[in-house]
Amino acid sequence: MKLVNDTAVAVDQLGMRQGAVAVYLDVWHKDLPEFLQLRTNNGDDRMKAHDIFPAVCYPDLFWRMAKRDLNQQWHLFCPNEIMTVKGYCLEDYYGEEWEQRYMDCVNDSRLSKRSMGIKDIVRLILRSAVETGTPFTFNRDTVNRANPNAHRGIIYCSNLCTEIAQNMSSIETVSTEICTEDGDTVVVKTIRPGDFVVCNLASLSLGHLPLEDEKQMKEKVATVVRALDNVIELNFYPIPFAQITNHRYRSIGLGASGYHHALAVRGIRWESEEHLSFMDKVFERINYAAIAASSELAKEKGAYHYFEGSDWQTGAYFIKRGYNSPEWKALAVKVSTQGMRNAYLLAIAPTSSTSIIAGTTAGTDPVMKRFFLEEKKGAMLPRVAPALSDKTYWIYKSAYLTDQTWSIRAAGIRQLHIDQAQSLNLYITNEFTLRQVLNLYLLAWECGVKTVYYVRSKSLEVEECESCAS
């Protein structure tokens, strides 16, 4: 872990931008307690890796047990020992099959295990989250149940920003031969490339789009889908594994920014049922347009390599999400006939920097402040929430003052229409108890949210009323 940490620090794009690495660990891994303290300020500094972003993969079983009784025991194992003794990798399974194999490991006396109370594990997770903002959350069973390409593999984890959820597999050396070529001795390796996931991202600026106009939205979404598909051909690939995977799956990540902006200009409050209903329709419309556009591209250029047998081809994708209207049924038939150009379509990235350039709000988060000063190259630049006026001022409620259950419920509604995941931040104050933070995690799991990004904490003690300050 130290080596990974130092690599992230060393690879800094010629001093312009420090590298960043997210490390995902299963919640049943034997080293979990130490892993959860990688970035905390207390403890042995030799065991720290402050420049790594830790993330934890959770099965449904863990959250069910945490909800039912925190005093239950949870058992941690060494994955290598499981492979040696049992002959399988526990991480290669999910859902009911994973639970059966996990309980088989629990009951096998040949395996050494580290047992802890779920309460103790949850306490470590939440303390780290409140203190450092991490670990990120990856709900493994939720992700893999919704995977439209489960026929080709499994999704083990997400990326640095928790919005990517695509099949992945390891790069394997099949054989190594020592040969002689032109009098020289050479080593020839035969390598199986695996699935090396690549991000091809773009975002719709919701605050600047006519979201109610179905025709215009279809046109704009289709344009972005085509552009992202072209990026796959035009891109520079520093390693061949990335190129191979990108051309096999042709995965893209169409996202969204300006979410709070779009609500504010329509006078829709974040903490309202109107918000949930409106964005449910918006993201269903975006999803429909993206699928239709990808299918048209498949008709024009051909389907992605693994389309046959996918949920797109069988129609299971539409059935799982309850898309039963005549329009959706017609699209399902069209997709089954024409194919899909892209294996994965939607992923909501954080867009914290690009949203400022676009003059809108970041990702799907509420604004942190209505106005603030941003430091850029030694200068302080004033920034204000987009379209800030007497009509939108009170609509722009600070993220730290917003009831986070509304943000999570909204994420759950959006998730139905997003085949990958979302960069969902939780905003808490020092007044939150650990139990309240745990309840947010449980609510996210219950709402079908696949991932949780940062837990951003802030004290309210020195806050001044913005409308009264002068």
Where are these regions (language model features)?
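Glycine- and acidic
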Residues: 17-22, 43-44, 104-111, 186, ...
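Internal maturation/activation junctions in enzymes
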Residues: 16, 220-243, 269-351, 440
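A structural-propensity feature for long, helix-poor, extended segments
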Residues: 1-21, 193-198, 211-236, 291-295, ...
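Active-site cavity-forming subdomains of large catalytic enzyme subunits
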Residues: 1-203, 210-211, 237, 241, ...
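Active-site-adjacent structural elements in folded domains
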Residues: 184-189, 238-249, 262-266, 330-331, ...
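Catalytic alpha/beta core of large soluble enzyme barrels
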Residues: 162-166, 228, 232-233, 317, ...
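Core structural elements
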Residues: 27, 31, 225-234, 245-267
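A glycine-rich phosphate-binding loop feature that marks nucleotide/adenosyl-phosphate handling sites
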Residues: 23-31, 56-57, 79-87, 139-151, ...
